[in-house]
Amino acid sequence: MGNSVMEKIKGGLVVSCQALEDEPLHSAFIMSKMALAAVQGGAVGIRANTAKDIRAIQSEIDVPIIGIYKKDYDDSDVFITPTLKEVREICETGVEIVAMDATTRKRPHNEDLKDILSAIRKEFPNTLFMADTASIEDVYYADSLGFDLIGTTLYGYTEETANKNISDDDFSHLKEVLKSTKRPVIAEGKIDSPSKARQVLTLGCYAVVVGGAVTRPQEITTRFTNEIQKIQEERGK
C-alpha cells in the first residue's frame, strides 16, 4: 500500500479538515462535507482528527487520509496522537497514514516514541507513519526511528519555536529540514496562501498540507476584517 499511497499524494495538496470542540464547525458530518469539497477542489489527500471524523470522511471521499488524534494530558505538552492508545485507535480506522508528535519532548505517562512506533508497526505493518516535528533535532530523531514521512507540522507551535513561521528567512528552516533527511518531507504549519504552498513544493517538499487557510472560516474572516479595520484606523488618524 505504501508506494501507491505516496504516489497519490506526490506533489499535491493535502487539506487538513479539523474543528475542535470549541469551534463552530465541530462535527464529524461537517468535516466529511468539508473534505468532500476539498477533494472536489483538487486536494489529493485529507488530514483529519479523531476516529469519528475519519470514518465520516471515509464515507465521502476516496483519497489518502493522514489521521491524527489530538488529546491533552496533564503531564505533557505533547498532544498530537500522543500515546500508543491514540495511535492504535487511529490505525484501526484503516487510514493510510498516521501522524504523531515526534518531538523530543516528554510524552504522557513517560511513554517512549521508539517503543510506540515499534509496537504499532507490528500490529499495522501496512500503515505509513508521519513524524510531526518542530526542530531539526526532531527531524534527526524521527529519521533515526524510521518514520516514513517527516512533517514540519509543529514548527512555530512549541515553546522552543514559538512565533516562528515556516516562511521566515526565505524558508530557512524548511530548507534545513530538506537537507537533514532523505525521507519525504511534508510541509505543514502556517502555510496560509497558494504562493507559500507553491514555494514549498518548488523547494523540494513531497506534498503540502494546508488547514486553516482553507477550512476554518473564522480564521479566514479574521484576515479580511483585520485589513478592513486598518482602513478605519487610518481614517481615524
Swiss-Prot record:
Keywords per UniProt: Carbohydrate metabolism, Isomerase
Origin: domain of life: Bacteria
A GO molecular function held by the record: N-acylglucosamine-6-phosphate 2-epimerase activity
Metabolic or biological pathway: Amino-sugar metabolism; N-acetylneuraminate degradation; D-fructose 6-phosphate from N-acetylneuraminate: step 3/5
InterPro entries hit by this protein: Aldolase_TIM, NanE, RibuloseP-bd_barrel
Protein EC: 5.1.3.9
Keyword Isomerase (UniProt): yes
The reaction(s) this protein catalyses: an N-acyl-D-glucosamine 6-phosphate = an N-acyl-D-mannosamine 6-phosphate
One GO location term (cellular component): cytosol
A Gene Ontology biological process term: N-acetylneuraminate catabolic process
HAMAP family, sorted: ManNAc6P_epimer
Family per similarity comment: Belongs to the NanE family.
Function: Converts N-acetylmannosamine-6-phosphate (ManNAc-6-P) to N-acetylglucosamine-6-phosphate (GlcNAc-6-P).
Protein name listed in UniProt: Putative N-acetylmannosamine-6-phosphate 2-epimerase
Source organism: Listeria monocytogenes serovar 1/2a (strain ATCC BAA-679 / EGD-e)
Gene that encodes it: nanE
